[in-house]
Amino acid sequence: MLATLADDPRRSRAIVGGRNIHDGFLFHQPIDLSRYPDLEQYGKTDGFSLNYYSNWSDFDIEFADPATVETLAAHLSTVWLRDADTNLARPFSIPVRSDGARPSGTARHFISVPYEDGHALEDYFVELVDAAQHHIQIVNPYLNLTPKLAQAVDRALARGVRIDIVGRIDLKGDIGGKFLTALNKLFVEKYGDRINIREFKAPDVVLHSKIMMIDERLVAISSVNLNNRSFFHDSENGMMVLDPAFYTRMKPIYDDYVAHSNPVATNVTIPWAYRLLFDEDWVRQAF
């Protein structure tokens, strides 16, 4: 999340989404930083090098209402003013109320510290999936579910909930892209005949948006990947909006992702070395 508080409250803004602080999230090609020798000049390398450059497609939501921005900024400040003994940013989530001029509904902003808050984010997402009655729509490039989340997905499918996912199975260009691609293919292999999985296609662009919509009335816009790393290791944040009117505003955006994607074949090929590697639970939990 990015929050800026201006002297004139009308100019204050908060932006919530999955965008990282990296040139590839803002520019279409590497920026020449040779004039600044202390800055890292990103290259075109692949693998585990941090000196890599990729173009990313992301999605954010901007808030301009002064009261909402101040509430979100105050919640973000708890990360910097977190408890020294437990490392917790309290509380896990807070309500955000509109000013009445906007569509009626309920919104909650959350910040997770999974290694200290008892995996509260994982429990939250499990509850959301368990609450789904007929339809879950997802945009997310990372598909390595935790065991508890996988069980929730299985329960949803068993009770007839339709699940549609726009992802990016081939994550070439991402750091560790070959490993992440293999994990995504394992997800396709397991769920491809039960979940409508599509691959976002855009030349030289890696999908990075994280959107989840449930039953045409709940929308989650966040930094949360559907993988072990987000639920077990990384701090994440996002906004949950329970409002059919907001879903109606988001639906064309989701439809645009669908329009720029293709169905994923279920007969994926996964090298045996990756199968052996990810048979180990502790390895999967690292991703």
Protein language model features and the residues they cover:
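Charged, low-complexity intrinsically disordered terminal segments
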Residues: 1-287
